[in-house]
Amino acid sequence: VEAVHYGESVDLTSADIVFLGGGPDREQKLASEVLLGMREELRTYVEGDGALLAICGGYQILGSNWLMGDESVEGLSILDLKTVRAGAGFDRLIENIALESELSPQPVVGYENHAGRTKLGASLNPFGKVVSNVGHGNDDDSGCDGTLYRNCIGTYLHGPLLGKNPAIADHLIAAAMERRLGSKVELVALEDEVELAANAYMAKRLGVPGA
């Protein structure tokens, strides 16, 4: 792990996993300005199958824009997605949520809290389909959350996402190792009974079919 402070340059050629989170508007604006200067390096990393997890504001920033209050701020335009203000209905989308995702044999559970409605372009697939009896996803309309492109995951699910969903953590680790080693890897199984039990409890509580 290499610590990088605000204003310092980042060498992504040695990175195995990149995480983009969200935060208060002021701090997110400062971070996005730095990221704009790294746009092509990040694009090369993503297109080269680098493992990347982007949550909430970090997910929005990967698209053409992100929202800061009523202001639309320039995004990285690495992925074909855009975020718009809410129309009629709820202002913020706040709820526990569960998804069906090709990356996990268990439902992907988490917590969403976002005002923006994110629309995917035709070239992108969602990270998962909303299967809980509550939850909104990308836009409260499509029935899907996030996006999955190469080894890049974008999502509105906080949680913590990886602690609640071991299969997603395993996917990112395996993707990073395979890119580094140039060959398929099989991860050594860890004891994750507690995490899976918590996942199953939330899936049942959220009304996931078959849970």
What are these regions (language model features)?
Residues 1-47, 163-211:
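N-terminal beta1-alpha1 cap of cysteine-dependent amidohydrolase-like domains
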